[in-house]
């Protein structure tokens, strides 16, 4: 530690997120000389406290999205007169972002019954060699365009597993979309 400086570490990553086995040890090691630790969720704080980091001199600061772009302005809400428009978005192409769930929805949409009731849009990067058959895909978008695109949809889904604190569901909620999620992570 440097007596002339205060060091702060923000912890937003863990092995549980991407099924690795070295990230937590590295973070704990780097935290040895830190004066104060900020966690992005209670969930990730609990992981590191259980692995030996002190809860003293730490806090949780939750994230938020830019209200200029992620809001309900010009949002048209579903009136029941067209298929429900389901959407998700992820920058990362990691499978744990929910691709097992999204693949299942894609397969359900093979049925004409569901095609008449539901549309699904995926915004972002896909895992290598992964392709949807029945899902509209859009490359990653900048904040303004992303907010506009989210507002064209009715329901947001996130299948993310062990996400410490994703921004994706926060952005969607601020756009007025109800969220379907797996009870996993922070």
In which residue ranges do the predicted regions lie?
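Short hydrophobic beta-strand element within catalytic cores of glycosyltransferases
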Residues: 178-181
